[in-house]
From Swiss-Prot:
Source taxon at top rank: Bacteria
Protein keywords: Cytoplasm, Endonuclease, Hydrolase, Metal-binding, Nuclease, Ribosome biogenesis, rRNA processing, Zinc
Keyword Nuclease: yes
Region (Disordered): 156-183
InterPro entries: MetalPrtase_cat_dom_sf_prd, YbeY, YbeY_CS
Any one GO BP annotation for this protein: rRNA processing
Cofactor info, note text: Binds 1 zinc ion.
Function: Single strand-specific metallo-endoribonuclease involved in late-stage 70S ribosome quality control and in maturation of the 3' terminus of the 16S rRNA.
Species of the source: Saccharopolyspora erythraea (strain ATCC 11635 / DSM 40517 / JCM 4748 / NBRC 13426 / NCIMB 8594 / NRRL 2338)
Protein's name according to its UniProt entry: Endoribonuclease YbeY
UniProt similarity note: Belongs to the endoribonuclease YbeY family.
Signal sequence extent: none
Cofactor(s) the record lists: Zn(2+)
Length: 183
């Protein structure tokens, strides 16, 4: 799965983490490994221009999704047997998201994760214009984020345990040495 990211926002963000949550969401939605996605982080004025041009709404917003193809609702890219797909672009505005994160009481990175998953779901054909659509999309978004956080925490615990085990083994001279004959 190819995920390109470009930070043109002037705000320093951990780009690999944004790519990671996008990949996790696409995997959870069973999107083909041949799919391609682009994520662009932009400044407030750029987002304002995009928001007005494409949504006819004034001012900036947090996330916009631009699908490359119109998908038949019965043939979304997350449906079984879907082949390669150029999903489209997700545009994030970290400066706008920073204020939302503060109001929500969480970090900018948590907000960018949420917005990335939100954008992925829009590219896959989900929407929240109607109450039932909103329940489905936001429920799925929250589940993907909870699963992502749980998987990340489990990986961090496993890495910490490996480091602790290595330190103990090294202290007693039993740690494996890299070199010929070792794995």
């Amino acid at each position: 799965m190819s995920i390109e990211i470009a930070n043109e926002s002037g705000v320093e963000v951990p780009e690999p983490s944004i790519v990671s949550v996008a990949r996790f969401a696409l995997d959870k939605m069973s999107v083909s490994q041949l799919a391609e996605l682009s994520i662009v982080l932009v400044e407030l004025d750029v987002m304002s221009d995009l928001h007005e041009r494409w949504m006819d709404l004034p001012g900036p917003t947090d996330v916009m999704a631009f699908p490359m193809d119109e998908y038949d609702s019965s043939r979304r890219p997350d449906s079984a047997g879907a082949g390669p797909a150029l999903l489209g672009d997700i545009v994030l505005c970290p400066a706008f998201a920073k204020d939302q994160a503060r109001k929500a009481g969480h970090s900018l990175l948590d907000e960018l994760h949420l917005l990335t998953v939100h954008g992925v779901l829009h590219l896959l054909g989900y929407d929240h214009a109607e109450p039932e659509e909103e329940r489905e999309m936001f429920g799925l978004q929250n589940q993907i984020l909870a699963d992502f956080r749980a998987a990340k925490a489990a990986a961090e615990r496993e890495q910490a345990q490996r480091s602790a085990d290595s330190a103990v083994l090294g202290a007693v001279g039993l740690e494996e040495q890299d070199g010929p004959g070792t794995h």
